[in-house]
Amino acid sequence: MSQDTGELKICERCLPLGENTPTLIRYPNGRECKFCTFPFDSYSYTINHTTFHTICCPKCATKNLICQVCLNDFEHGIPMHLRNSMKQLLNENADSVIPKNDMMKRFIGLSSKQVAPLNIDKLKQAESIRKWRVRELPFNSNVNDTKDTFFLYNIDPNLTESQIVSQLIVATNNNLERENTSLKLNSKLRIATLTFKQDPDLWTQKLISILPKFKVGPTVEKCYLLMKGNRIHITSCLSDDFDVNNVNSEPEWDRLVQKIITKDAKIIGTEPGKKKGKPKSGSKSDLHTKSKSSRRRHTLDL
């Protein structure tokens, strides 16, 4: 709204009304308008030790429906260029506008009662395909809570979907059919999801009962699948809209995930990738080797 100081067009966000309204200082032809470049009577005032100035003339402010200080739209409080872009979109094809940020949602909702409701479904769809962050993934979920989707991690990047499914079939004594499994793998991030197309409840419970388990904390249980020296950890995936190929590969991904894997491995009893060391001097194998060599020497002496 315009102020009571003559021809000024200053919004309440820049110049609040009330008892503490600051004193305005007038400078006749003190500035050049930002739009028309003509000189105009500018004003300045101070709020909380910050000085504000009018940077466009009242005529241009009235024409563009903007504040003389912040140049934002008077009604919606958004930048003028953003408002003009959205108006252009609305005029071209109002039904196709999808709000992409909070300002755009606010403007469309206030300026058109027809556009916003028509795009709610599209907006929800756009938000549903956002990138998942590592802290949102179900690394620490309870496998016993699995409804119909398993979450797999610590997968060797050289393994393929077919190889993992084959190992699952072996683990179920060939009772599980390949056509009944749906495994989505992200080799780069070493994660996957597993679902069953037929009898999902039955096969979910069967797999949980067959695979070896380990406990993380007092309440959380996980399963694991041994495969080519690699231990694939399995938990529950409780989110229906989770997509392994739509995960944000953050810089901290490796550090956070490796921390979880190392913790799991210590609970199971063997750290991942740990190799058997050489036998120490004085061990049984070492003594056995020495006795063999001594027998050979005695034979030669004879």
Curated annotation (Swiss-Prot):
It holds the Pfam family STL11_N. Residues 268-302 are annotated as: Disordered. Disulfide bonds: none annotated. It is found in: Nucleus. Its main location: nucleus. Residues 290-302 have a biased composition (Basic residues). GO terms for biological process: mRNA processing; RNA splicing. Keywords: mRNA processing, mRNA splicing, Nucleus, RNA-binding, Spliceosome. One of its GO terms (molecular function) is RNA binding. The keyword ATP-binding does not apply. InterPro entries: STL11/RBM22-like_N (IPR048995), Znf_C2H2_type (IPR013087). Transmembrane segments: none annotated. Belongs to the SLT11 family. Involved in pre-mRNA splicing. Facilitates the cooperative formation of U2/U6 helix II in association with stem II in the spliceosome. Binds to RNA. Associated with the spliceosome. This is Pre-mRNA-splicing factor SLT11. It comes from Kluyveromyces lactis (strain ATCC 8585 / CBS 2359 / DSM 70799 / NBRC 1267 / NRRL Y-1140 / WM37) (Yeast). The gene is SLT11.
